[in-house]
């Protein structure tokens, strides 16, 4: 059923012969926005290799998160969830364009079928980015995931699951992990709209919710270059059982040097305090 079984999927550029698309990478977000989508799952690579650094494709995807349709006068924020790539376990093996700043980049963890859910997959691409920034953003199960299987052409998954008519198989890869996070984004968007009179959370808020609720997988203290900020845990992101305060773009800065000071009261000094600050950054040069 997936993480968000009631969500509406909107396939875009399926079977496109040109890569990147003839209309540029932003064709993805433009078509998705036209279909009413809040974001996209991007379980693919641009084909520009690993340790690509920050170049044109990374810059374009940073722009897409800030504004998914360059051709309209108003900015239309758009969530991009990427798979980290399957070039691990070496350092700085994120596949392009996953060294962009604004997308949510997903590492793969082991599924219960394959071992401990708190182990990172050996194949999962690692950070850091070439310029030293942290990557990936977060992790999700991506190993031995029950998924639909191609019924023609080369198979990319393991042996079919018995009793499924050769239509389902156990598949592994960060391409399996990223949809878990995309499903969490859908759940968090629906939850946020319910609490905020239908308002859609910004891409930065959604990333903040995911990061704040993530749990350490035990490979090293988070954040780290294997799992980012940890394994996604949606109930924790929703703040179940703890006091929470959220601020989503309530103050807009208009000039360099502007500041905002926020005072937070701590009701129980014996309990941990976790603060997450995320912003959708301007694209680099």
Model-derived segments and their meaning:
Residues 61, 85, 173:
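Active-site glycine-centered loops adjacent to acidic/histidine catalytic or metal-binding residues
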Residues 1, 28-39, 44, 150-153, ...:
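Extracellular low-complexity, Gly/Ser/Thr-rich intrinsically disordered linkers
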Residues 25-29, 58, 62, 94, ...:
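Extracytoplasmic/secreted envelope proteins and their assembly/folding machinery
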Residues 66, 109-178:
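Catalytic-core environment of secreted peptidases
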Residues 69, 75, 85, 201, ...:
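Secreted peptidase-domain scaffold signal
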Residues 57-77:
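Catalytic-core regions built around general acid/base machinery
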Residues 1-22, 35-40, 47-53, 72-79, ...:
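Subtilisin-like serine protease catalytic core
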């Amino acid at each position: 059923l997936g993480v968000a079984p009631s969500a509406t999927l909107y396939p875009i550029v399926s079977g496109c012969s040109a890569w990147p698309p003839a209309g540029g990478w932003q064709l993805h977000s433009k078509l998705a926005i036209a279909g009413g989508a809040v974001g996209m799952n991007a379980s693919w690579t641009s084909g520009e290799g690993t340790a690509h650094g920050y170049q044109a494709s990374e810059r374009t995807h940073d722009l897409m998160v800030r504004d998914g349709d360059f051709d309209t006068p108003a900015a239309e924020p758009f969530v991009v969830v990427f798979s980290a790539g399957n070039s691990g376990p070496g350092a700085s093996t994120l596949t392009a364009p996953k060294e962009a700043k604004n997308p949510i980049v997903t590492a793969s963890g082991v599924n219960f079928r394959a071992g401990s859910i708190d182990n990172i997959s050996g194949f999962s691409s690692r950070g850091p980015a070439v310029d030293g920034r942290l990557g990936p953003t977060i992790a999700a199960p991506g190993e031995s995931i029950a998924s639909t299987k191609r019924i023609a052409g080369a198979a990319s998954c393991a042996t079919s699951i018995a009793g499924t008519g050769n239509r389902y198989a156990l598949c592994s890869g960060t391409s399996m992990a990223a949809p878990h996070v995309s499903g969490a984004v859908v759940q968090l968007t629906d939850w946020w709209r319910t609490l905020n009179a239908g308002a859609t959370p910004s891409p930065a808020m959604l990333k903040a919710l995911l990061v704040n609720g993530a749990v350490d997988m035990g490979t090293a203290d988070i954040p780290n270059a294997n799992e980012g900020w940890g394994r996604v845990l949606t109930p924790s992101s929703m703040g179940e059982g703890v006091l929470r305060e959220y601020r989503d773009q309530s103050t807009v800065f208009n000039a360099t040097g502007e500041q905002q000071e926020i005072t937070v009261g701590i009701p129980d000094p014996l309990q941990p305090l976790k603060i997450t600050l995320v912003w959708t950054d301007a694209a680099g040069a």
